[in-house]
A protein has these predicted regions:
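Surface-exposed, beta-sheet-biased, low-hydrophobicity segments with strongly acidic/polar composition
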Residues: 1-156
Length: 156
C-alpha cells in the first residue's frame, strides 16, 4: 500500500522505485519511505522514542534524518532496539524500529505478536513538507495480522 501524505490518499504507482507520487509504503511490518534506496524522493524520517503526540507540533531543531538503505529500512531500523533477543523466547523477540515482536514469548498479547512501540516519527515528505506520524496497530478489529494502521498530521 502506497500513501500520498499530502492528499491523504492511497496511490498505486506503476513503478514505485522511480515515481514521486507516494511518501510511505506499507507491506506487513515493512514500511518504506520515498527516499534513499526505496524511491527517488527526498523523504526522510526522524524518530522520537517516547515522544508525546500532542506536544509534537514542529520539527525538532536537533532532528537526525534517516532514509532507507540497502539492508535497513528507516522505519524498521529507527529508533534502535532497546529490547533484544531473549534466549527464553527463542532469541527472536525484540524491538524492530516501529514495532516490538514477542517471538516465542507471551508478553501479554500472545506469542508471535507485533505491537507498535511508543514512537513519534517526524516525516519529511517527497515535497519537503513535514508530518508527525505514529503507528497505532498491526491487526485489524477482527485480529487479522498485516493490517497496519497509523495516524499522521502536518507540522508547522
Amino acid at each position: 500500500v502506497y500513501v500520498d501524505l499530502i492528499n491523504a490518499l492511497q496511490v498505486e504507482p506503476a513503478e514505485p522505485a522511480s515515481e514521486l507520487t507516494w511518501d510511505i509504503a506499507l507491506m506487513r511490518t515493512d514500511l518504506q519511505i520515498n527516499g534513499g534506496i526505496s524511491g527517488p524522493g527526498d523523504a526522510a524520517l526522524h524518530d522520537m522514542l517516547g515522544g508525546d503526540w500532542s506536544d509534537t507540533i514542529s520539527v525538532p531543531t536537533d532532528a537526525e534524518w534517516h532514509t532507507d538503505e540497502p539492508d535497513a529500512l528507516a522505519f524498521v531500523t529507527y529508533p534502535p532496539a532497546e529490547n533484544t533477543g531473549d534466549g527464553a523466547c527463542g532469541g527472536i523477540n525484540g524491538d524492530f524500529g516501529w514495532y516490538y515482536y514477542s517471538g516465542f514469548c507471551d508478553d501479554g498479547e500472545g506469542v508471535h505478536h507485533i505491537s507498535p512501540r511508543d514512537v513519534i516519527y517526524v516525516v519529511r515528505d517527497r515535497s519537503g513538507s513535514y508530518w508527525r506520524l505514529r503507528m497505532l496497530a498491526y491487526y485489524d478489529d477482527a485480529g487479522s495480522s498485516a493490517h497496519p494502521s497509523f495516524e499522521f498530521a502536518p507540522l508547522q
